[in-house]
């Protein structure tokens, strides 16, 4: 059983997946910091010195000065400011992944086009019986029809 697990874990796909998860986690932290520490303060400043992480709707009916106070008191709140931060965070990650996947697909198509070599046709269809025949044939071996194209070319 250990041997099977070792073979499974050492397959390229599993290791690639593990590396992707680790890099994705680190990338997520960077994007979260970008949103929380750089983008949202600038947007907050532009719309009137608002800290989006403190925007909430108090459902308890009591008065609180901040989201932290409401949460400490156990009040029910709708934290739409944190939701906006997470939404922007998601959009940045989704757009980044879209760009990476688009570039990977572009690279795959580029290499695929390079590999596609123009192969010269060696067969054609008989106009009478529609079977595949050699391109140089002057008579169809299946229906024995004389092929006009080949006779015209040889004259």
Swiss-Prot record:
The entry's localization annotation reads: Cell membrane
**Family matches, as PANTHER family:** LARGE-CONDUCTANCE MECHANOSENSITIVE CHANNEL (PTHR30266:SF2), MECHANOSENSITIVE CHANNEL MSCL (PTHR30266)
Q: What GO cellular component term, any one, is given?
A: plasma membrane
Q: Which domain of life is it from?
A: Bacteria
Q: Where is the chain membrane-spanning?
A: 14-34, 81-101
Name of the protein in its database record: Large-conductance mechanosensitive channel
Bilayer topology term = Multi-pass membrane protein
Gene3D superfamilies annotated for this entry? Large-conductance mechanosensitive channel, MscL, domain 1
Q: Which PROSITE patterns match?
A: MSCL
Q: What does this protein do?
A: Channel that opens in response to stretch forces in the membrane lipid bilayer. May participate in the regulation of osmotic pressure changes within the cell.
* Subunit relationships: Homopentamer.
Which UniProt key words apply to this protein?
Cell membrane, Ion channel, Ion transport, Membrane, Transmembrane, Transmembrane helix, Transport
């Amino acid at each position: 059983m250990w041997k099977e697990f070792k073979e499974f874990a050492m397959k390229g796909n599993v290791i690639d997946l593990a590396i992707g998860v680790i890099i994705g986690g680190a990338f997520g932290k960077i994007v979260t910091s970008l949103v929380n520490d750089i983008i949202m303060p600038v947007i907050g400043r532009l719309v009137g010195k608002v800290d989006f992480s403190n925007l909430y709707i108090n459902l308890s009916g009591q008065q609180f000065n901040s989201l932290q106070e409401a949460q400490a008191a156990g009040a029910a709140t709708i934290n739409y400011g944190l939701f906006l931060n997470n939404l922007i965070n998601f959009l940045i990650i989704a757009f980044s992944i879209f760009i990476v996947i688009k570039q990977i697909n572009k690279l795959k198509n580029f290499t695929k086009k390079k590999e596609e070599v123009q192969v010269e046709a060696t067969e054609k269809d008989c106009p009478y019986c529609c079977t595949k025949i050699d391109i140089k044939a002057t008579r169809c071996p299946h229906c024995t029809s004389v092929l006009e194209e080949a006779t015209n070319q040889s004259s």
